[in-house]
Amino acid sequence: MMSDYTWFEGIPFPAFWFSKEILENSCKKFVVKEDDLIILTYPKSGTNWLIEIVCLIQTKGDPKWIQSMPIWDRSPWIETGSGYDKLTKMEGPRLMTSHLPMHLFSKSLFSSKAKVIYLIRNPRDVLVSAYFFWSKIALEKKPDSLGTYVEWFLKGNVAYGSWFEHIRGWLSMREWDNFLVLYYEDMKKDTMGSIKKICDFLGKKLEPDELNLVLKYSSFQVVKENNMSNYSLMEKELILTGFTFMRKGTTNDWKNHFTVAQAEAFDKVFQEKMAGFPPGMFPWE
């Protein structure tokens, strides 16, 4: 069992998937092209749901692509070896995904017209989702309790480092025309509105019936049951009994798991780390 991290420039990555050589390539040699579309998230923020929506927008709601090709081939991960190789060989407009923090991302992005969609989720729900995810998969250090994981998370001692630094870094681009910020909570509350917002950002005009197909085939239950999207094809030796890649897909599940003391400790760190953002910036506040 690979239970430790590959550390790269101060950020921990799950050792099974990441070597320093792969990360060197992804962060320093990868060249972003003008017509690229990049989906960026911190882990466990709704990444697969967003990929599914974007794929369906590109096919105007036709589900054939999402039902026939694994999600990691439709939108390869820049920072994995296989994803990096696929992307460097890919012709035409590329769709890609990354969890990389801003300071590690290829500098070629910042002088390009490539479009970026950055999805943010309430970090308390991210934490709970990550706790259940990592406890069932053989890729990372296992916390002995949720309390331990809260401590790790608040210190940034988890895969891809600090949520707070990740968000602060990427949100510095929020005024750029080619950078769209979405919130998981807003997407859950008004999925169709979010689909239309993504269409506008991408310059895609979909008819009402096509928008309805995007909505239908990107629903949590449909994505959870799609073997091309739910990671059921993942190698069995990585998965422990009881694993499900997509667990609940809800908001505010953290309230079912945090103690009062944990909630207070989290709030204190959140206020300190996210000071300076305008009031009402985050929909869960």
Curated annotation (Swiss-Prot):
Keywords: Cytoplasm, Lipid metabolism, Steroid metabolism, Transferase
UniProt subcellular location: Cytoplasm
GO molecular function: alcohol sulfotransferase activity
GO biological process: steroid metabolic process; sulfation
Class of this enzyme: transferase
Keyword Hydrolase: no
Biological role: Sulfotransferase that utilizes 3'-phospho-5'-adenylyl sulfate (PAPS) as sulfonate donor to catalyze the sulfate conjugation of a potential wide variety of acceptor molecules bearing a hydroxyl group. Sulfonation increases the water solubility of most compounds, and therefore their renal excretion, but it can also result in bioactivation to form active metabolites.
Record-given protein name: Sulfotransferase 2A2
Organism of origin: Rattus norvegicus (Rat)
Gene that specifies this protein: Sult2a2
